[in-house]
Curated annotation (Swiss-Prot):
Positions contributing to ATP binding: G16, P17, T18, A19, S20, G21, K22, T23
Site description Interaction with substrate tRNA, residues in chain: T107, R129
Subunit structure: Monomer.
One matching Pfam family: IPPT
Organism: Azoarcus sp. (strain BH72)
Keywords: ATP-binding, Magnesium, Nucleotide-binding, Transferase, tRNA processing
GO biological process, one term: tRNA modification
Family: Belongs to the IPP transferase family.
GO molecular function: ATP binding; tRNA dimethylallyltransferase activity
Taxon lineage: Bacteria, Pseudomonadati, Pseudomonadota, Betaproteobacteria, Rhodocyclales
Cited function: Catalyzes the transfer of a dimethylallyl group onto the adenine at position 37 in tRNAs that read codons beginning with uridine, leading to the formation of N6-(dimethylallyl)adenosine (i(6)A).
UniProt-listed Gene3D superfamilies: 1.10.20.140, P-loop containing nucleotide triphosphate hydrolases
Protein name: tRNA dimethylallyltransferase
Length: 320
C-alpha cells in the first residue's frame, strides 16, 4: 500500500558545502527538467550582496525561474521559519504549474527545518535585541554569557562566551518564554509539506581539493571587488557588524578591513579560514542527514562529470 506522502508531487533537493558545484549542477538539471529553483541560502536572500555570496548571475538566473534570491534588505533579518513558510508556498505553486521545485543551497538549518519542522520559538523582538546589544557593548559578550549561565546553564554550556549571535538569541528566547531553551525546542510545529522530498547531497572525496577550490574562489571574490561591495553596502544601508547580513563569511572580514582592524593579507587569510570552517559545519550537517534520511543520495562533488551524475540521479529519483 502506498503512503500518503507517495501521492504528493516531487521536489528535488540539492544540498552541499560551499564551492561544491551546486549552482552548475542545478543549472544542468534546468536544462533537462522543467524545474524552478528555490534558493536554500541564508545569504542569497539579501539584496546588493552579490560578490561575497557567489550569487548566480543574471544570465544564470535567466535559465529558469529562481526564487528566494534578493528578497530582503541587508538591514533585515531572515529566519528559518520565514524560509519554511515561503518555500512551502513556492513548492505548492510550482507543482500546480506542472513544474518541479528544485531546492538548492547550503544552509543546512533550512533543509532540516523543512524536513523536520520548527520548534515553537518566540519570534525575534527588535526592542529586546537592541537592549541586549547595548548591554553587550557596555559589558562584553562574556558577561552576557555568564548571565545566560545563571538563567539557563545547559544552553550556556553549549555556547562559547564570544558567540554573540547565539548568546543573543538564547537570552531573547529565555526572556520571552520564561523557560529554558530545551523546553521551547521540545515544542514543535509540524506543518505538512506540499511535496515529497527527493534529496541529493554533494560531498568531496578529498577535503584538500575542496579547500583549494575555496581558496581560489575567495581570491576571485576579492579580485571581483568584495571590499568595494561591502563599502558600498555601508554607504547605502544603516548596518552594524553584528547584523546577520554582515556576519556572512567574507563580509565580516571585509568589514574589519574597512574599519582598519586588519590588513588585506589578514582579510584574505581569515576569509579563507572562515569559509573552510563553514564547509566543515555544512558537511557535519550532511553526515547527520545521511544517517537520519535513508532516501538521501550522496555524490562526489569532485567528479569531473558531476552535472551528468546529478541529472542521472534526479531522473532515477523521479522515476523518469
Amino acid at each position: 500500500m502506498s503512503s500518503p506522502e507517495s501521492a504528493l508531487p516531487p521536489a528535488l533537493l540539492l544540498l552541499g558545502p560551499t564551492a561544491s558545484g551546486k549552482t552548475a549542477s542545478a543549472l544542468a538539471l534546468a536544462a533537462t527538467l522543467p524545474v524552478e529553483i528555490i534558493s536554500v541560502d541564508s545569504a542569497l536572500v539579501y539584496r546588493d550582496m552579490d560578490i561575497g555570496t557567489a550569487k548566480p548571475s543574471a544570465a544564470e538566473q535567466a535559465v529558469c525561474p529562481h526564487h528566494l534570491i534578493d528578497v530582503v534588505s541587508p538591514e533585515e533579518a531572515y529566519s528559518a521559519a520565514r524560509f519554511c513558510a515561503e518555500a512551502s508556498v513556492l513548492m505548492r505553486d510550482i507543482s500546480a504549474r506542472g513544474r518541479i521545485p528544485l531546492l538548492a543551497g547550503g544552509t543546512m538549518l533550512y533543509f532540516k527545518a523543512l524536513r523536520d519542522g520548527l520548534s515553537d520559538l518566540p519570534p525575534a523582538d527588535p526592542v529586546l535585541r537592541r537592549a541586549i546589544e547595548e548591554r553587550a557593548a557596555a559589558a562584553g559578550w562574556p558577561a552576557l554569557h555568564a548571565e545566560l549561565a545563571r538563567l539557563d546553564p545547559d544552553a550556556a554550556a553549549r555556547l562559547e562566551p564570544t558567540d554573540a549571535q547565539r548568546i543573543q538569541r538564547a537570552l531573547e528566547i529565555v526572556t520571552l518564554s520564561g523557560a529554558p531553551l530545551a523546553a521551547s525546542y521540545a515544542r514543535r510545529e509540524d506543518a505538512p509539506l506540499p511535496c515529497r522530498l527527493l534529496p541529493i547531497a554533494l560531498a568531496p572525496s578529498d577535503r584538500a581539493v575542496l579547500h583549494a577550490r575555496i581558496e581560489q574562489r575567495f581570491d576571485q571574490m576579492l579580485a571581483a571587488g568584495l571590499v568595494d561591495e561591502v563599502a558600498a553596502l555601508r554607504e547605502r544601508y544603516v548596518l552594524q557588524p553584528q547584523m546577520a547580513s554582515m556576519r556572512c563569511v567574507g563580509y565580516r572580514q571585509a568589514w574589519e578591513f574597512l574599519d582598519g582592524e586588519i590588513d588585506r593579507a589578514t582579510l584574505r587569510f581569515k576569509g579563507i579560514a572562515a569559509t573552510r570552517q563553514l564547509a566543515k559545519r555544512q558537511l557535519t550537517w550532511q553526515r547527520q542527514f545521511r544517517d537520519q534520511w535513508p532516501e538521501l543520495v550522496e555524490l562526489d562533488c569532485l567528479a569531473p562529470d558531476l552535472p551528468q551524475h546529478v541529472r542521472d540521479t534526479a531522473l532515477r529519483l523521479l522515476g523518469a
